[in-house]
Amino acid sequence: MTRVLDHGFVRLVDHMPQQDLDASIVQAARVSYGDGTKSTRGDRGLIRYLLRHWHTTPFEMVEFKFHIKMPIYIARQHLRHRTASVNELSARYSVVPKEYYDPTLFRGQSVVNHQGSEGIVEVNGVETTQALEQAFGVYEQLLEQGVCREQARGVLPQSTYTEFYWKINLHNLMHYLQLRLDHHAQQEIREYAEVIYNLIEPLVPITMQAFLDFRVNGIFLTGPEIETIRTGRNVESPGEQREFEEKKKILGI
């Protein structure tokens, strides 16, 4: 179990197959030729070819099951990846433990990315903690008064921790990681994504190296961006031009 934030965690519960996960990807890819696993170098080359050319089915043969605990408002982002199987704690059936995410620092609203953040904002942390404590106090009071759990939960803040089992195949997990490891993703979910990556990397080291090379550290150029490189003209859309400038910095052009 790896701790995340103040009360959260990620635990790798199980994986399929139990061993030689990289090799199982190769075996699935070669089944039509009747070949088993060849040399490690051959396996590495094939895995990199599959990932580079978006041959995704062999990666779906590997699955991981996690037990994850995170704040509700972070879980809402995490569970947007609908290709996973999920079973979550129910506040209708269970009394919610008094655990909430209480950040020590508050980030400012980004002036460029309207859904992002930047810098640090000075706030009265005592007041935010008091608000969270009050919400849980009201929740507990409602339960003591006999209010049903399915209604009493309505006063709980989004920073309340939830937990769930999450099963996903490697192909879809790489898509999740590509999005959630990106620097544009919210900091809190990036921390969870980093932990998930670190848990699976020793199990599929060849695949994860290819994933870093071709997905995380690779750059995709759009048609307008390629035309801009050829002609020297700016991309028409201001938003697309801004994204292109970021890519140019990475490329050093």
Where do the language-model regions lie?
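Family-specific signature for flavin-dependent thymidylate synthase
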Residues: 1-253
